[in-house]
Every structure is written in C-alpha cells, then in structure tokens.
C-alpha cells in the first residue's frame, strides 16, 4: 500500500511540475525625455523559454481604447527574446492620454480544463448563503447596500478597473457595478458576464438571482489570474425586477462606449434549480410550436428539469456556439437546451425577462442562461426561494461551461502583461499679461514658482505617466511666491501645471 501511495504521489508531482509556467514581466521602470519613453524590465521564465514580446499603444477616449500605430519602436521586441534585463523605447505620440501594454508569451498553452475545474461549489454555496436575503431598494435597502459593497470590494481587490454606472429611477439612484479586465492587444473587443443583484421585495432571492451573482463572482476571481487578448467585463445590474431598468440604463445612457465591440454577453438569470424528477419542468404556451425539436426532447425525457436553457437570438449565434462547445468539451455532464428566438424575441415574451433583452434591443449578441424560473422552480418570487432548495453540482457546471467559453473567446495568453498609462502634453511657456517663472530646472530640494498678475491659481504637478504628486490652490496674494518641497520625490520628469483664470501654463521640470 505504501509503495502504491508513493507512486500515486509521484505521478501527481510530475504532472504538477510538468505544467509549463508562463513568463513574467518584472521590475518595470520608465524614463521619458522630450522624444521617447523607455521601459526597462526583467523578463523571466522558469523554463528559460525564448519569448515573443509585443508592445501595444492605445489612445484613451472616454472609457474606450483606440489602437494606435507607432513607428520607430526599438529594443527587445519581437520573436525569440531571451530572458534577462530588457528595454523598449517608444517615440512619444502627440498630446493625449495613452495606454501602453507590454506583452510577453512563450508559445505554450494553459490546461483550460484545469482552469475550468477551479470552480468551487463550496465557494459558491458560501457566497449564496451570504447573498441570500431581501435585496430591494425599499423592503431590503440595508441588505441591498451590503451586497453592493461586497461586489465593489471584490472587483477592487482583484485589481480590475472598477467603475459604477449610475442612473435615476424615480427618486432612487441605481448603481450598476462594473469591472474591466482589459485585453492586452484588443481591449475594445469585449466579452461580458453579468447578473442582476436585486430581488423582489417579498423573498430572499436565492435562485433569483443570488445564483447569478455568486456565479459571476466566482468567475471574476478565477479570471483575475490570467491575461487575455480581448477584454472581459463583469457587471452587477441593479433594478432588474422592475423591468430591466439597470441594464436598459447601462445600454442606453452612457454605459457602453461607441468604440466598444461587444462580442458576447453571458447573462446569468437563475442558474441553480435542478430536478431529475419527471414532470418537474413545464413549458410556456406555444413553446411546442416555436421550438418543436426542443419540446419533443424535453417530453421524451419525461419533462425533467435537468438542463440549463441557453436563450439566444440570431445575432447571438457566435457566443451561443461557444457556450455549447465549452459545455461539451469541459462539462459533458451538463445538459444544454438552446432556444433561438425569432428577431429580438417579441413573439416570446417569457424569454425576454432578463437583462440580455436590453443588449438585444441595442443589437448586441447576448445569451440568457437560466434554469427556467417559474417553469421549473415553484419557489420563484416567493419566501421559499432559499439556498437549500438549490443544486450546487448543477450550478457549478453552468459556471464551468461559462468560464470555459470566456477562456476560449477572449483568447487567453500563456504569458504576462504590463500596463502603464502615459500622458503626453506639450509645454506652454507663458500667457498674455502674466509672468511666471518655475525654477530651478533640474530642481533640487525646493521648487520655486514666482508670478506677476496671476491672481488666484492652482498648482498641479504630476508624472508624465499621469500620477498626481502635488495639488494646491493659492489665492492672489500667495500666488506671487510659491515654494514646494521636493526632497522626497523620485528622479523623474514632471509636468507642472500653473492654472489661472486666464489659462494654464505647462512646464516640464526634471529632477535628477
């Protein structure tokens, strides 16, 4: 027995350490002069594989990114880059705000099945138990606020780029919580995983829709450990139960950038109720006429509620096929019934009862992944919608199929990505009628700013990458002679903004 156990352990260790590790970009620093910015970094790879190194430049426009072609990039870039100390120099583009992505990968692949299998049903159950409770703006405001806080805290802790999209619904300000895991080379091509976090005012909302929120949270935790070509966006929608108000506002009131290409939405709408009992699944009126093959298959299986419903329209075939393929590949035990509704679903109102419909209206591909709501779960919108009525095995499999689709569609990278924001501004020396001197340059322990006729002013000092170092307002009396201590500032080039009512003076100051 001892030898057998030792052999099993040895095989496990060989398999564990045989997995090729992705390269890492470490110890990054940057130096900027009037013409270029140079990134110095260490490229490491546990197996000393040669790597491909890319550098991508994007112009930031609102919440979107516009790819920019920059000629003349030099240094350790391209194929067959060995490990060690590296440097890449980039000619500065015109004035504006930019995102610089350095990408390094070694040509190997991740074991996607192993990533899918990281979905933990005990974790899902724990999240569900915490989320369970009335989450409504009137009947359960305290619980709703607690759930909002936990979603925001999670998105922030995972080092995504979080934001909150707000809109008015009567006197209530709804909040859609967003986390962007931006893609390395195509950040404007976006996959979305969403779930609404509110529930009806008279129930604990375990299946509807704590299951969706817990599933989204689990995927966001796992996805955070990897890099992708495309972006993955997580959204917690507010006020779904009153008519998809949160998602309608997001789609129609500034949540989506016109520069974004939404390649697919996985909308979780009740993903935890499962029954293998005959006649546990009912169907909407007319279902057999619109979906005869699916209706016949459900009838042949004695109307068991043992499948996840994948609702799509014709515009959503790509993301639907990806979900079905993922289920077949990574979770073959998950039974999927796919329904393609005509147009945007006007003939099938029962299949428009979730946030995917807001995306359909906007022409974006989206799926509703659902256990069927009241057509299976008789606890729907009642006080009995509790966690202990749900099936963790089934829910876990839905989450696994979803994460598998995201891994494939967002193009996971077996490598590392370093992102840096860069601000390029041309210096402005003077304004008419105002005399300003900023000295010494290079600066020492004290930076002096003297002026005449400036009046009230604001001094703003930041690094060329946009990090704010100093900000202070001065009245007309104090603005004539300003002294700023700089002894603790690191060596770098800084942008000094001297803002007055007449305009802004920009100067670049160096500290050696």
Language-model features: locations:
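Bacterial Sec-dependent N-terminal signal peptides
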Residues: 1-22, 426-428
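Active-site-adjacent substrate-binding region
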Residues: 271, 277-422
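Extracellular acidic, Ser/Thr/Pro-rich low-complexity tracts
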Residues: 42-49, 59, 453
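N-terminal capping segment at the start of a domain
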Residues: 108-143, 198, 376-385
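A glycine-anchored, Pro-Gly-centered beta-turn/N-cap motif
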Residues: 82-84, 88, 96, 455, ...
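C-terminal outer-membrane/trafficking sorting elements
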Residues: 429-512
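Acidic/histidine-rich catalytic neighborhood of metal-dependent amide-processing enzymes
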Residues: 200-315
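A non-catalytic alpha/beta surface segment that caps or lines the substrate-entry region
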Residues: 126-182, 336
């Amino acid at each position: 027995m001892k030898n057998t156990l030792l052999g099993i352990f040895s095989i496990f260790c060989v398999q564990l350490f045989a997995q090729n590790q992705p390269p890492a970009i470490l110890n990054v620093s940057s130096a900027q002069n009037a013409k270029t910015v140079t990134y110095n970094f260490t490229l490491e790879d546990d197996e000393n594989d040669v790597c491909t190194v890319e550098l991508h430049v994007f112009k930031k426009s609102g919440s979107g990114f516009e790819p920019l072609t920059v000629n003349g990039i030099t240094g350790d870039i391209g194929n067959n880059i060995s490990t060690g100390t590296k440097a890449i120099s980039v000619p500065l583009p015109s004035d504006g705000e930019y995102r610089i992505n350095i990408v390094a990968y070694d040509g190997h692949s991740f074991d996607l099945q192993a990533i899918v299998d990281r979905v933990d049903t005990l974790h899902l159950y724990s999240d569900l138990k915490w989320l369970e409770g009335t989450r409504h703006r009137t009947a359960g405001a305290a619980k709703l606020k607690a759930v909002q806080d936990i979603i925001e805290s999670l998105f922030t802790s995972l080092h995504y780029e979080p934001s909150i999209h707000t809109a008015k619904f009567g006197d209530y300000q709804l909040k859609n919580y967003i986390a962007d895991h931006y893609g390395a080379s195509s950040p404007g091509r976006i996959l979305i995983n969403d779930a609404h976090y509110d529930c009806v005012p008279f129930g604990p909302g375990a299946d509807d829709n704590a299951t969706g929120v817990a599933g989204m949270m689990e995927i966001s935790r796992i996805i955070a450990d990897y890099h992708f070509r495309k972006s993955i966006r997580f959204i917690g929608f507010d006020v779904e139960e009153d008519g998809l108000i949160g998602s309608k506002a997001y789609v129609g009131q500034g949540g989506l950038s016109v520069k974004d290409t939404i390649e697919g939405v996985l909308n979780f709408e009740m993903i935890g109720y499962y029954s293998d009992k005959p006649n546990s699944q009912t169907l909407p009126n007319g279902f057999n006429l619109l979906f005869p093959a699916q209706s016949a298959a459900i009838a042949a299986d004695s109307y068991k509620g043992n499948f996840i419903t994948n609702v799509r329209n014709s515009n959503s075939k790509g993301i639907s096929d990806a979900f079905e393929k993922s289920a077949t590949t990574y979770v073959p035990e998950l039974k999927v019934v796919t329904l393609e509704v005509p147009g945007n679903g006007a003939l099938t109102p029962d299949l428009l009862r979730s946030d995917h419909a807001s995306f359909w209206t906007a022409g974006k591909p989206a799926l509703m992944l659902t256990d069927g709501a009241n057509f299976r779960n008789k606890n729907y919108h009642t006080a009995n919608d509790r966690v202990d009525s749900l099936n963790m095995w089934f829910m876990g499999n839905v989450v696994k199929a979803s994460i598998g689709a995201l891994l494939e569609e967002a193009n996971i990278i077996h490598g590392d990505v370093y992102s840096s924001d860069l601000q390029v501004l041309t210096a402005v020396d003077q304004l008419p009628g105002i005399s300003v001197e900023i000295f010494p340059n290079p600066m020492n322990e004290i930076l002096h700013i003297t002026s005449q006729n400036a009046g009230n002013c604001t001094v703003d000092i930041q690094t060329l990458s946009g990090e704010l170092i100093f900000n202070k307002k001065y009245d007309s009396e104090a603005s004539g002679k300003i002294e700023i201590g700089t002894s603790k500032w690191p060596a770098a080039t800084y942008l000094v903004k001297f803002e007055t009512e007449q305009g802004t003076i920009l100067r670049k100051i160096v500290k050696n």
